Amino acid sequence: MDAVEAHDREAWLALFADDGVVEDPIGPSAFDPEGKGHRGPEAIAAFYDNVVAANESIKFTIRESYLCGDECANVGVIRITFAGGSAMEVDGVYTYRRSPDGKIAALRAYWEADNIRSVS
């Protein structure tokens, strides 16, 4: 999350394996209408440009973290501040699977649009 919070696109993209996938959120959404995820460097870069970089700031507060082998699950809340200052939060579970070379093979986000709340 450091790279996201710092708006460091190249550092964030470098975290992913060449065949990595981002599913944020899991299933069909405004970010991924077909629900297939953003797979590979170009698709992950487009996700960053269209979703991450489009926001003023993104802060993830981890409440609990579970590590098992090459996988990790973080439970917490993500707060997104939009250009202009309005903000929203949503609780979720974010899972990560590491590839053999230590990069992120899969980032999967479990959150529901119905649970998004406006904050000030």
Predicted features by range, described:
Residues 45, 49-120:
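A beta-strand edge to alpha-helix "cap/lid" segment located at domain peripheries
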Residues 1-8, 15:
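Short, aromatic-enriched amphipathic alpha-helices that serve as compact interaction elements
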Residues 1, 35-36, 87:
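Short basic coil micro-motifs at the edges of alpha-helical modules that engage polyanionic partners
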Residues 10, 17-69:
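A solvent-exposed, acidic/Ser-Thr-rich amphipathic alpha-helical stretch
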